[in-house]
Amino acid sequence: MPELPEVETTRRILEPYLLGQRIQKLLHQDPARYRHTERAEGRKVLGISRRGKYLILQLDQGLEAIIHLGMTGGFRFEPHRHTRVTLVLPQQTLYYTDPRRFGKWWVVEAGDYREIGLLGRMGPEPLSPDFTPVGFKQALAQTRRKIKEVLLSQEAVAGVGNIYADESLWLSKIHPERPAHTLSPAEVKRLHRAIREVMGQAVEAGGSTLSDESYQQPNGEPGYFQFAHKAYDRTGQPCRRRGCKGRIVKMVVGGRGTHFCPVCQQNSR
């Protein structure tokens, strides 16, 4: 958390407040975590985009501000007890909050991502035309890692984190420990379709909010996709697939808590 749907929701809400505005001050007390931010002061925001889980502010004079929200990062329109960065604009002040302090900021020359290596090797956006079944199949065929680990790596497809990997694997009936290269063409197509469906629905629902200190939209509203979860955070509850008698179990895959139905997501190869 936050993953692509939460970051995209944040981008859409912030865009009208940021676009065309000049950053007057960018205040914080952690230069090791929020790097080179003094370079953004006095710069106009020409655009706000997203790549995977990263927000990217295009600034004038060839700079970009890259923001990774970490596990608990987000923006607010009012001061918050966990405010870490204050972004002062001519007619608005935005407050970046992060209770667990895992988020990071960088201000870099546009396209210079040497400090942010993942941006340079990230896979296609799941809701873009670049994310194709053929390309996805080629990426999975090249690795013996477990499919859940591959999805989390961001290299086969961008922006899929723990929640939406579990949801996509549930929807496609694929066990999270299946070696990626063993997926059949039909399974790859199902997973490709599931990722697009889950991500699209989650974006429209404003993402998922799991607790009071987890992701919220900048206006203070929660996301609502958690009410549609089929696997994530449903340990011990009945599987929601029609006709399935299983219950959701939790295990660890790639160091991450992983939720799935052992009845309809069997580890057959």
Can you describe what each PLM-predicted range is?
Residues 1-119, 258, 262-269:
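Acidic, proline/glycine-enriched N-terminal capping motif
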Residues 22-40, 49, 54-56, 60, ...:
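Basic, nucleic-acid-binding surfaces and adjacent catalytic neighborhoods in DNA/RNA-processing proteins
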Residues 1-4, 126, 130, 137, ...:
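Generic detection of long, well-ordered alpha-helical segments
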Residues 10, 14, 136, 164-165:
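Generic structural signal for hydrophobic residues
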Residues 69, 124, 241:
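Active-site donor-binding loop signature of nucleotide-sugar glycosyltransferases
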Residues 103-145:
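A short, charged helix-loop
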